[in-house]
Amino acid sequence: MEIIPAIDMQGGRCVRLYQGDFQRVTVYDDDPVAVAHRWVAQGAPRLHLVDLDGARSGHPVHTDIIRAIVQSVDAPVQLGGGLRSIAAVERALELGVQRVILGTAAVHDPELIRQLVQQFGDAIAIAVDARNDMAATAGWTETAAISAIDLVERMAALGVRRVIYTDIARDGTLSEPNIATTRALVRPGGPAIIASGGISTIDHLRRLAEVGVEGAIVGRALYTGDLSLSDALAAVQ
């Protein structure tokens, strides 16, 4: 199971939101590139970048920072936030991002997802962000009329091979991940599942590994020191 540090960017800084609320933001560093270097130096196998301003505006905003990270770290990068067109996905991949993550488009434009999967295959991942088990869109500011489980099934039917599942109510809270829903999403022959939201202890990571997820994205717990990356990596070897 991969342990993937999250780097959420807002206004050029590295931040964390509480339950996806843009009004409840904590700034952890003014230099996301330096943060990326720190996590990779500590052994991160991959980085999870989120362009929060992009998620709200509908188009990537932190392009220069993303490019600087991709060009200067020796680890693959996945990127989400504001990627809602073929052109936006192509631009992200041209930056050197290995994997792009689409969320809003998965709900509102499944035909786009089908085309992207046909064209880019494993480079496409879907963010299934859920509030009260219903999918959220537009930077988590809107709730759609489809459940997380149904959305994953819909994406699987389109050929999607990887889903990042986040329980918004737990994100940034240091509480615990939603093990029950995560378990329901992990199915033989289904998309690989990467878990996110509320992961803050070694026990959480071990429970997720038992469920069978491909990876776990850790954010606030790494920044507060509640969880050390080296301990997390060692726990799932």
Swiss-Prot record:
Signal peptide residues on this chain, from the entry's feature table: none
Domain of life: Bacteria
Principal place of residence: cytoplasm
Matches recorded under Pfam families: His_biosynth
GO molecular function, one term: 1-(5-phosphoribosyl)-5-[(5-phosphoribosylamino)methylideneamino]imidazole-4-carboxamide isomerase activity
GO cellular component, one term: cytoplasm
Record-linked Gene3D superfamilies: Aldolase class I
Catalytic activity field: 1-(5-phospho-beta-D-ribosyl)-5-[(5-phospho-beta-D-ribosylamino)methylideneamino]imidazole-4-carboxamide = 5-[(5-phospho-1-deoxy-D-ribulos-1-ylimino)methylamino]-1-(5-phospho-beta-D-ribosyl)imidazole-4-carboxamide
Record-linked InterPro entries: Aldolase_TIM, His_biosynth, HisA_bact_arch, Isoase_HisA-like, Isoase_HisA-like_bact, RibuloseP-bd_barrel
Annotated active site: D8 (proton acceptor), D129 (proton donor)
GO biological process: L-histidine biosynthetic process; L-tryptophan biosynthetic process
Enzyme Commission no: 5.3.1.16
Protein location: Cytoplasm
Top EC group: isomerase
Keyword field: Amino-acid biosynthesis, Cytoplasm, Histidine biosynthesis, Isomerase
Pathway: Amino-acid biosynthesis; L-histidine biosynthesis; L-histidine from 5-phospho-alpha-D-ribose 1-diphosphate: step 4/9
Keyword presence, Phosphoprotein: no
Family assignment from sequence similarity: Belongs to the HisA/HisF family.
HAMAP family: HisA
PANTHER family cross-referenced by the UniProt entry: 1-(5-PHOSPHORIBOSYL)-5-[(5-PHOSPHORIBOSYLAMINO)METHYLIDENEAMINO] IMIDAZOLE-4-CARBOXAMIDE ISOMERASE (PTHR43090:SF2)
UniProt name for this protein: 1-(5-phosphoribosyl)-5-[(5-phosphoribosylamino)methylideneamino] imidazole-4-carboxamide isomerase
Origin species: Roseiflexus sp. (strain RS-1)
Organism classification: Bacteria, Bacillati, Chloroflexota, Chloroflexia, Chloroflexales
